[in-house]
């Protein structure tokens, strides 16, 4: 009977690559939040903009910022896990 050797599902390098991808995604989400807030500011001076547009865009910007923070937290956890060699 042949048994496979125990192996780690992800190498340390793979974890660090994933952590970097998460960090990069967090930066993108921060940029999207910035753009959404800029749009909110622009619409504030536009009388033709529907009333619902600014609050909706503000909520989306906040969601992007929250997601960015969560991705950063996940990236840091992966980095710590890789550094610990677990």
Regions found by a protein language model. Give the residues of each.
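N-terminal secretion-targeting helices of virulence/extracellular proteins
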Residues: 1-86
